[in-house]
Design a protein with these regions (language model features):
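Glycine-rich anion/phosphate-binding loops
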Residues: 53-67, 107-111
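N-terminal amphipathic/basic-hydrophobic helices that include classical n-h-c signal peptides
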Residues: 1-9
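Conserved mixed alpha/beta catalytic, RNA-binding, or beta-rich assembly cores of soluble enzyme
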Residues: 20, 28, 107-111, 123-210
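N-terminal beta-loop-helix "entrance" segment that forms/cooperates
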Residues: 39-59
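A charged helix-plus-loop insertion that forms the helical arch/lid used to bind
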Residues: 87-107
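N-terminal basic/disordered segments at the start of proteins
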Residues: 10-40
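Short glycine-rich anion-binding loops that position phosphate/pyrophosphate groups of nucleotides
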Residues: 80-83, 183
Length: 210
C-alpha cells in the first residue's frame, strides 16, 4: 500500500544546469512518474516542459505553496543551481525569513546553498530524496574500477583523509580533499574542485576524496 501511495505522489524536481538534470528528468518521464519542475537553471532551460515553473530562490513561500498545491511531499535536486544575485533578488515573506541563512551559506559555496535549502524544506515538512532515487544505475558499487590499486600507505592516507573530510564537513561545506603520504595536500573551497586541482603541482600524485 505504501509503495502504491508513493508511486502516485507527485515528485518535485529542483533542476539546475548540467547534463545530470536532463538525465534525471528523462528517466522520470520513462518511468511515467508524475512530476513538476522548479527550474533553477541559468537560462530557464526547462521552459518548454508544461510542468515547469520558474520561481526565484527568494520566493520561498511561492515554492513551498507550489509543492503543497501539487500534493507533493518529496523533492529532489539535480544539476548545478546558479548562485543568485542577492542584491537584485525579489523576496516574499518566507524568503525574507530564510534569506539570511542562504546568504550565509553562499559564502561557503554551492553545496552549502543546497544543504541550507534542504534544511528549510525539512522545516516545512518536505522531504528531499536522493538525486539518484530513480537513477540507481548512475551510482557505482564499492570496489576497484581502475588498473591501479591502493597500497597500504594509500589506504592509511585515505582513512586519514576521510576522517579529516568528515570533521571539516561538519563545520564547513567542503566537497573534496587531496591526500598523499598521510598528509592533506589540498581542500576544496567555494571555488570548486577544478580550482583546487589547478593549484597542485603537476606531479603531486595525490588521492582525491570527494
Amino acid at each position: 500500500l505504501f509503495a502504491h501511495h508513493f508511486q502516485n505522489k507527485m515528485i518535485g524536481l529542483f533542476l539546475g544546469d548540467s547534463d545530470f538534470s536532463e538525465i534525471v528528468l528523462k528517466k522520470i518521464k520513462k518511468l511515467n512518474k508524475k512530476y513538476f519542475i522548479i527550474d533553477f537553471s541559468k537560462n530557464n532551460k526547462f521552459k518548454k516542459d508544461n510542468n515547469s515553473h520558474r520561481i526565484s530562490i527568494g520566493k520561498f513561500g511561492k515554492i513551498i505553496n507550489l509543492i503543497k498545491e501539487k500534493n507533493s511531499n518529496k523533492v529532489l535536486f539535480a544539476g548545478k543551481i546558479a548562485k543568485p544575485k542577492f542584491s537584485t533578488l525579489r523576496l516574499d515573506l518566507k524568503g525574507i525569513y530564510y534569506m539570511p541563512d542562504i546568504i550565509k551559506a553562499s559564502k561557503l559555496g554551492d553545496a552549502a546553498i543546497i544543504k541550507t535549502i534542504i534544511k528549510i524544506l525539512n522545516i516545512e515538512n518536505i522531504k528531499v530524496i536522493s538525486s539518484i532515487s530513480f537513477n540507481p544505475e548512475l551510482a557505482v558499487k564499492n570496489g576497484n574500477y581502475t588498473k591501479l590499486k591502493p597500497n597500504m600507505n594509500d589506504n592509511n592516507s585515505i582513512k586519514k583523509g576521510i576522517t579529516y573530510f568528515n570533521k571539516l564537513n561538519n563545520l564547513d561545506h567542503v566537497q573534496a580533499v587531496i591526500v598523499k603520504n598521510n598528509t592533506i595536500l589540498a581542500t576544496e573551497d567555494r571555488q570548486g574542485t577544478k580550482k583546487m586541482l589547478s593549484k597542485l603541482k603537476k606531479k603531486s600524485e595525490g588521492i582525491l576524496i570527494k
